[in-house]
Amino acid sequence: MYQPLLLLPLLLTSAFATPHDPTTHQALEKRASFPIPSSKGSVTYSSPKTISGTFDGGLKTYGRGVKCTGQKEGGEKDAVFVLEDGATLKNAIIGADQIEGVYCKGSCTIQNVWWTDVCEDALSLKGTGSGTHRIIGGGARNADDKVIQHNSGGKVIIQDFTVQNFGKLYRACGNCSKQFKRTVEISGVKASSGKALVGINSNYGDTATISGCASSVKEICVEYEGTDNNKKEPAKKSSGPSNACKYKEPLASC
């Protein structure tokens, strides 16, 4: 006689339980997906391709036919593309078979460029100038350390960039032998599964302005005490919004 009474709570629980919503899983999958375009072919270079004007990659995948050496420091000779001052690279996919990705020797524009697997760095901004570097659209994933390494001076503008599974999206060089004041402006970023979005040297007057969304990113903006001694690692000063790190906390989830 007690069985109906025991079953009643179970029936009520089932009746009022939240039904399975298949769109929930789809939303999570969508959030975690990497929207890299389909490749239109592949090109392997035996040496870096130098660009002095505008190069449209036609959404082909470009590489060097070599195995990534991890965080072992490479150089310009290991890059896929080397951009001269004022050059533009657009509509290209950088494959996993490379070490240094893209080098800019001065101001440059990187538009709709995607890195399937970052090796040492995805994009290295070199030179001694104080111009503007623009990264528009595109994305990168699987960077053990940095995606964008800013060694030169000037401003970096990053718009509508997608980054996943990374150490840092942007890092102003912490121990270059010649230091500069550097500025980074990030808008429309979509970041997930990272250690830090931005690292700057506030003692040199660096500033970062950030907007967009971030999911599972431990720190958004980290300030360091930069040094010109390249045998010394820069010390971390602080993390979070400040006069140097300009953003509203928390950033929205992606």
Swiss-Prot record:
Q: Which UniProt keywords apply?
A: Calcium, Carbohydrate metabolism, Cell wall biogenesis/degradation, Glycoprotein, Lyase, Polysaccharide degradation, Secreted, Signal
Please provide, in alphabetical order, the Gene Ontology terms of the cellular component aspect for this entry.
Answer: extracellular region
Chain segments carrying region Disordered? 228-254
One MF term in the entry's GO annotations: pectate lyase activity
In which broad location class does this protein mainly occur, judging by the first location in its UniProt entry? secreted
Q: Which reaction does it catalyse?
A: Eliminative cleavage of (1->4)-alpha-D-galacturonan to give oligosaccharides with 4-deoxy-alpha-D-galact-4-enuronosyl groups at their non-reducing ends
**Cross-referenced InterPro entries:** Pectate_lyase_PlyH/PlyE-like, Pectin_lyas_fold, Pectin_lyase_fold/virulence
- Does the keyword NADP belong to this entry? no
- Where does the source fall among the domains of life? Eukaryota
Q: Signal sequence span per UniProt?
A: 1-17
Q: Which residues form a coiled coil?
A: none
Where does the UniProt entry place glycosylation sites?
A: N175
Its annotated compartments are: Secreted
EC number in record: 4.2.2.2
Q: Which PANTHER family match?
A: PECTATE LYASE E, PECTATE LYASE F-RELATED
Q: Which family does it belong to?
A: Belongs to the polysaccharide lyase 3 family.
Q: What is the name listed in the Swiss-Prot or TrEMBL entry for this protein?
A: Probable pectate lyase E
Gene coding for it: plyE
